[in-house]
Amino acid sequence: IQFKELTNVPKYHEDATVWEVTEKDGTHLGVLYMDFHPRESKRGGAWMTSYRSQKTVDGKRDAPVISIVCNFTKPSANAPALLTFDEVSTFFHEFGHALHGLLSNVTYRSLAGTSVPRDFVELPSQIMENWAAEPEVLNMYAKHYKTGEVIPEALVNKLKKAGTFDQGFITTEYLAASLLDLEYHSQTKDITVDANAFEKAAMKKIGLIESIIPRYRSTYFNHIFSGGYSSGYYSYIWSGVLDTDAFEAFKTTTLFNPEKAKLFRENVLERGGTEDPMVLYKRFRGAEPSIEPLLRKRGLDKKTEPLKKVKG
């Protein structure tokens, strides 16, 4: 796909830029607004918004209008805007959501783009983050802004090691919170409970050691009570299983494999919520996702000796 900046269309703020997105042959796909810098009255964080979702009317594709909004530091008079690696990953992430909206090709607007089950919506965004960290891709953008020197290999290796740091703890506390969420939402009767006692019993049930607690305790677990993740907090790590397994299709061939990219586009990005997510995924990948790529990415695939008690 190709991007061409549009200068003759309305913008909600002067900081925003507007781009027409087309196929290689020039066929119109949609319009993308990009709004990268913080300002007064703009909330923090980063997100993708669909101003107009795609639909098909009388056989004609009604193109979407999508935006990516971030809060990257503005360039100064003497230097461009320099991004941290986390900020780069954020952009790749939101760009994945944008592609999901821009490449949608369905009949009904209510099923377009990111209108999919919550535990599937992060696949297009999270898979993009994998490319951001690949040495082949880093060499394209991670350069010294004055000299043009490409990021040193030693620094790339440190970046890779940092990605697995403390993942045992991080994964365990997350899974504990996910299982606590499911325990709360698996109750079949109206009951009054002591939140701390309920949580303690739930953690004992799964065998969580006392030195690790759930990422969110019951008394401030907003995600599952008012944040839209009721019985769905697990979706973050499930999306991790999906995105790492999906990325293997490229990692084991070439990072820019056009055949695999075409399969991903036609069976995931274009289809929105028109079919069961696992049906779409298997059509792309040829099989159900494996957990092994996620374990490798987190450095948790290595077999280790069990801890032994120390006398004394």
Model-found features: residue ranges?
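Cation-handling catalytic/transport regions enriched in His/Asp/Glu
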Residues: 1-312
